[in-house]
């Protein structure tokens, strides 16, 4: 399904929060949405590998990577594993790599930027916690909607009329 964050903002102005416009779109889907699963890690992707290997249908992995642009938290292997397990998308407050290859993976990805240097494989970080970045607080089980225009957040699932999709 395609989502139009501009129309969702107009219709649900009192319910949603808008994420600061600092993210770029990567991956094969230009829009995505789902229930938020949170992860906080800094330049370590071990827990990311574990999470994307789990069932992800209807979910979006939101990673607080501390805003690091020194090491990529998302690469082709992570994106493909997430897509294979049904994840709708990944929002990464950090960087990606393998940009050209990511475009061919059926998953939405938004991140701060790209760098060719990969992150450590260590399992350092925390899951299922409130995280703060880009002007919003994201809680596990919030709902997130993303497209080329931006990212919005809601405490509950938004009803999407066919005219908004």
Swiss-Prot record:
Transmembrane segments: none
UniProt keyword Cytoplasm, yes or no: yes
Coiled-coil boundaries: none
Location(s) in or outside the cell: Cytoplasm
A cellular-component GO term for this protein: cytoplasm
Description of how the protein assembles with itself and partners: Homotrimer. Binds to both RNA-binding sites in the C-terminal region of Rne and to RhlB.
Family, per entry: Belongs to the RraA family.
Name of this chain's protein: Regulator of ribonuclease activity A
Species assigned in the record: Colwellia psychrerythraea (strain 34H / ATCC BAA-681)
Source species taxonomy: Bacteria, Pseudomonadati, Pseudomonadota, Gammaproteobacteria, Alteromonadales
């Amino acid at each position: 399904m395609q989502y139009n964050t501009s129309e969702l903002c107009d219709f649900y102005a009192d319910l949603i929060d808008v994420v600061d416009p600092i993210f770029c779109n990567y991956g094969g889907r230009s829009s995505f949405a789902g229930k938020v699963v949170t992860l906080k890690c800094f330049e370590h992707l071990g827990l990311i590998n574990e999470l994307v290997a789990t069932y992800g249908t209807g979910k979006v992995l939101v990673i607080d990577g501390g805003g690091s642009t020194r090491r990529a938290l998302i690469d082709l292997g992570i994106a493909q594993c997430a897509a294979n397990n049904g994840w709708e998308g990944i929002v990464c407050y950090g960087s990606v790599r393998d940009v050209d290859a990511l475009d061919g993976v059926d998953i939405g990805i938004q991140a701060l930027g790209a760098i060719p240097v990969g992150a450590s494989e260590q399992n350092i970080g925390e899951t299922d916690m409130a995280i703060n970045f880009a002007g919003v607080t994201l809680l596990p089980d919030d709902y997130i909607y993303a497209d080329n225009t931006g990212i919005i957040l809601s405490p509950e699932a938004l009803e999407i009329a066919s005219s908004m999709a």
